[in-house]
Design a protein with these regions (language model features):
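Conserved SAM-binding strand-loop segment of SAM-dependent methyltransferases
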Residues: 77-89
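Conserved SAM/SAH-binding beta-strand->alpha-helix loop
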Residues: 61
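Conserved beta-strand signature within the Rossmann-like core of class I S-adenosyl-L-methionine
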Residues: 133-140
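A short glycine-rich, Lys/Arg-flanked "PGG" loop and its adjoining helix->strand segment in the class I
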Residues: 119-132
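Conserved SAM-binding loop of SAM-dependent methyltransferases across substrates and taxa
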Residues: 39-51
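A short SAM/SAH-binding and catalytic strip from SAM-dependent methyltransferases
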Residues: 101-116
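Conserved SAM-binding loop
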Residues: 68-69
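A short acidic, Gly/Pro-enriched loop at the edge of an enzyme's catalytic core
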Residues: 93-103
């Protein structure tokens, strides 16, 4: 799928992140939560692929969020991308906002087993923010896998 995007649209996306985004089920119009967005490159690419959908990208690092916001002015002003500085285990869906169809994370300690207690809390928070059919895809940068969520 990445071959269908002009070079100028994907220039800030590494091969690793391009492969991650290529592996995600991204029908047009969906709502996506990215956990651990870093400087926002994957979030911007997902926005490009989901038509009139929406991406809400979170990261615990204030510096990462500042970089993401600085590099995403057009996507933010379109209303299709938002960033929030919050840890996965502390995230809550803002009141009145529709739930997400998909959540994804790459190399996030709370979701890859490095921080089990934070992971339990994060999974509960993510499940609460997804539609009943919503999916969570987690990866290590080389492969993505779907995690079962507590419902």
């Amino acid at each position: 799928m990445s071959g269908s995007y002009p070079e100028e649209m994907t220039r800030d996306l590494s091969d690793r992140l391009r492969a991650v985004v290529d592996a995600l089920p991204l029908p047009e119009g969906m709502r996506v939560l990215e956990i651990g967005c870093g400087p926002g490159a994957a979030a911007r690419e997902v926005v490009r692929r989901i038509g009139d959908g929406h991406v809400h990208a979170i990261d615990r690092s204030p510096r990462a969020i500042a970089q993401a916001v600085a590099g995403s002015a057009a996507e933010i002003s379109s209303g299709r991308l938002a960033f929030e500085q919050v840890a996965a285990e502390d995230f809550t869906l803002p009141a009145g906002r529709p739930p997400f169809d998909l959540a994804f994370a790459v190399r996030v300690g709370a979701l890859d087993g490095r921080h089990p207690e934070a992971g339990r809390q994060a999974l509960s928070r993510i499940a609460a923010a997804l539609t009943p059919a919503g999916r969570l895809m987690v990866g290590d940068g080389a492969a993505m896998a779907e995690l079962r969520l507590p419902r």
